[in-house]
Amino acid sequence: MTTLIKNIGLYRNGKVTENQNISLDGKYIKDFPENPKDEDYAEVIDGKGMLAMPGLVNTHTHVAMTLFRSYADDMELMDWLQNKIWPAEDHLDDDIVYWGSMLAFAEMIRGGTTAFCDMYMFMDSCAKAADKAGIRGNLARGLAGISPNAQSGLQENIELFEKWEGAGDGRFHVMLGPHAPYTCPPDYIRQVRDEAMKRGIPIHIHLSETKGEVENCLKEYGKTPIALMNDLGLFELPTLAAHCVHVTDEDIAIMQEKHVRVAHNPGSNLKLASGIAPVVKMRKAGITVGLGTDGASSNNKLDMFAEMRLASLIHKANTYDPFAITATEAMEMATVDGAKCLGYDDLGKLEKGALADIILVDRSGFHWHPRFDSVSLAVYAGNSMDVDTVIINGKTVMRHKEMTTIDTEKLYAEVDRVTEKLYAFSKK
């Protein structure tokens, strides 16, 4: 199907050009016609006054954890995990994860996120929800070598790959998801590595999120988590490492040499008091850094506009440098760099031949005036509620702030139902 998006401000190559048009052919961007005729297209979207941007890419999250939002707040990571989250997760099932995931996808699409990278459990249910929602995703089954389900979890992840890799007209890719060095002993990491190498599956892992994690790893193995994973050969596979808050110069050198990509989660890292990742130093070393929200239970929202703003502001403050992460750089981290983190070279940019993941942002609000610089406004003043229209893989999944793939009334009812089901354990 051919689509014309006309009369828009077009974000390309770090700047916005007004009164532009985009034509789509199926799931790809075809060109940028100067004088298009409406009758030549099957669908015409008039974006007058709006800003066309690449869809935002959430490089690290746990989508079904929307159902833990506000359940456990103001805690440090290990206390939060061990005493609240992990016990509650024992009560998850396919039904709960499906609707928790659908809630996340509604929130993502509403806020302009068109692609995500998830690590969780009951991932077949997550994939089914993502397919119904029409969103793009990289999927990984979270794996814990210390769990009684270590082997069955790995098998689930392999089956997820066999079923979903390349599915959804190319919208889905699958990764293996060893949770972290503190939940995955070396022998298990080697097993995951070997299974991934047999099939060419990339890796998604949490690394060096807290000081305590690094200190314990040094005490047990004499190496940082990143050095340990490198010695175990994990980085011989394409790897996306979430967090990387407490990393040494030697760690950064390893990551640069092995082309490890980083999912930076500023909101979650601040809320859990984990620290601030040395993103400026990593970017200067040539490491690709994307942005993520982490789960809604530790953020507590899936708002990539908020993450762009945070990523720019906290690194200015942390380095005493107003140029540390500019508005344009924050935008690139949330789009094209995020796409690279997920393994794409034809996503996250509005170029001929690129995948048509596009959002139209309403610039009519008070906070969009005066309009000296639309990139600056998007990052520092814009918010997720400004998003008007969302196109993923060439298909319109939200039009004028109305979902086309998700029945929101049914969604709210089902979320209430599965929330009651999930938390029944706390009433016993």
Regions found by a protein language model. Give the residues of each.
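Metal-coordinating catalytic core of metallo-dependent amide/deamination hydrolases
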Residues: S125-V245, E250
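Divalent metal-coordination and catalytic microenvironments
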Residues: I8, I22, K27, G49, ...
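Active-site microenvironment of metallo-dependent hydrolases
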Residues: M1-Q20, L24-D25, K30, N35, ...
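Active-site gating loops and adjacent loop-to-helix segments of metal-dependent hydrolytic enzymes
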Residues: L67-W99, A106, A133-A144, K211-P238, ...
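His/Asp/Glu-enriched, well-ordered alpha-helical/loop segment
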Residues: D231-L234, P238, V280-G365, A381-N383
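Alpha-helical scaffold segments that flank or form the walls of functional sites
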Residues: R69-I135, E156-A167, D416-K427
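Helical hairpin unit composed of two closely spaced alpha helices linked by a short loop
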Residues: K271-A273
